[in-house]
């Protein structure tokens, strides 16, 4: 199988007023095409730090990360990040609105995605009116 991700001797340290904190200490793993990886552990063990580094949100202290050309890494947090004062369609459109500008084409594109993923009857609803799984789908779109 072809490796899509290789992480070798990855470490992340933070400086605090109390000294250095080791968030990730020398981890190594790889992921083949069509493999799944679950990252589990106790609170504060470095799961989010690892994901932030892999997604390019944070930097590593040392180590090597090789990502297959063209592959992008993203992740979804357990808690949704939807704005409670916006309906589902407006929440889902927000990223495109900010990155570009609000257009009829963007709204139509997002609406089609929401319908495709089973949210047709919820476009005008607000996040509190949806189940956790439905809110996750909106956040993913």
Model regions and ranges:
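Short coil-to-helix segment of the ABC ATPase nucleotide-binding domain corresponding to the Q-loop/switch region
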Residues: 86-95
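Conserved ABC ATPase signature
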Residues: 126-130, 134
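ABC ATPase nucleotide-binding domain "signature" region
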Residues: 38, 138-141
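Conserved ABC ATPase "signature" region
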Residues: 104-122
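Helix-to-loop junction immediately C-terminal to a conserved catalytic motif
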Residues: 55
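Signature (C-motif/LSGGQ) region and adjacent switch/coupling loops
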Residues: 20, 89, 123-126
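The feature captures the beta-strand-to-loop junction immediately N-terminal to the Walker
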Residues: 40-42
